[in-house]
Design a protein with these regions (language model features):
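Residue-level signature of catalytic and energy-coupling elements of molecular machines
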Residues: 60, 130, 226
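Mid-length scaffold segments of soluble, non-membrane domains
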Residues: 96-168
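Hydrophobic alpha-helical segments involved in membrane association or supramolecular assembly
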Residues: 47, 51-62, 101, 113-116, ...
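A cross-kingdom marker for long, charged
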Residues: 27-33, 200, 207-240
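Sec/Tat signal peptide C-region and signal peptidase I cleavage site
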Residues: 15-22
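N-terminal Sec/ER secretory leader and immediately downstream segment
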Residues: 24-106
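Bacterial N-terminal signal peptides that target proteins for export
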Residues: 1-8, 18
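An amphipathic alpha-helical core segment
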Residues: 164-206
Length: 240
């Protein structure tokens, strides 16, 4: 009889402990995005978005890093900076269009050469995506994952990417063609001045803008085109 009383008392204590903890634990799990049915959904969505970004990043980097990846794509082509557009216009009228074209081509070649290095800087944003981030992105617009990605990586990516772009610019002769172009201008237009320009900053910024633009296009494809969902996970998450 004493043993039965002991078990009944233990059961009562355990039930009381469960009742006391049930509310707070449910709240904690909910805050973590892990409660009930939504936990599996959120983890699946997060995994799908990470995979979409992974696939999209690879496709975007492949697209822009090939020859003419920037130069032949009018949406992301790096053109003459606004600060020296007047210089380019004057030179073109004076018969030096070839020098202007060479300068534009060299900037785009530098971006194409540097682009493959960008992929290695994207891993952190994949790993740090929370379930809450994933849910908002999934329910957002056609490029919401890209915008999230950009907000999380752009500053860090710029700092890491700029030296690579600068090195590429030296290799393809951007600075050389720029100086030649400015030299032609100052010779043709006596006493003319040319506004100072940070070419490294300009090309790096434009190269990243172009990369994120193409990544956004890849995200749109995955969201809207079944043929772009190249894995079972992408088909599962975005096919519903």
């Amino acid at each position: 009889m004493k043993r039965l009383s002991f078990f009944l008392m233990a059961a009562a204590l355990l039930w009381g402990a469960y009742s006391a903890l049930a509310g707070p634990m449910d709240g904690l799990l909910s805050d973590m995005g892990l409660s009930g049915k939504g936990a599996g959904d959120d983890s699946r969505i997060a995994a799908g978005l990470k995979e979409a970004l992974s696939v999209g990043t690879k496709n975007a980097v492949d697209a822009v890093s090939r020859t003419d990846g920037y130069f032949a794509n009018q949406a992301i082509k790096i053109v003459v900076p606004d600060k020296i557009q007047n210089v380019a216009n004057v030179l073109s009228k004076l018969g030096y269009r070839e020098q202007v074209d060479a300068f534009v081509l060299s900037m785009n070649r530098a971006a194409e050469k540097a682009a493959p290095q960008a992929a290695s800087f994207f891993v952190d944003a994949f790993q740090n995506m929370t379930f809450e981030d994933a849910r908002k992105i999934f329910e957002g617009g056609d490029t919401s994952a890209t915008e999230f990605f950009k907000s999380k990586t752009q500053d860090k990516l710029y700092g890491a990417f700029k030296p690579i772009v600068s090195s590429s610019m030296d290799e393809v002769g951007v600075t050389k063609t720029y100086k030649e172009m400015v030299g032609k201008y100052t010779s043709a237009v006596p006493f003319a001045s040319v506004e100072s320009l940070d070419l490294d900053h300009y090309v790096t910024t434009k190269a990243l803008d172009g990369l994120f633009y193409v990544l956004g296009q890849e995200e749109k494809k995955i969201r809207t085109d079944p043929a772009a969902r190249v894995t079972d996970l992408l088909k599962d998450v975005f096919g519903k």
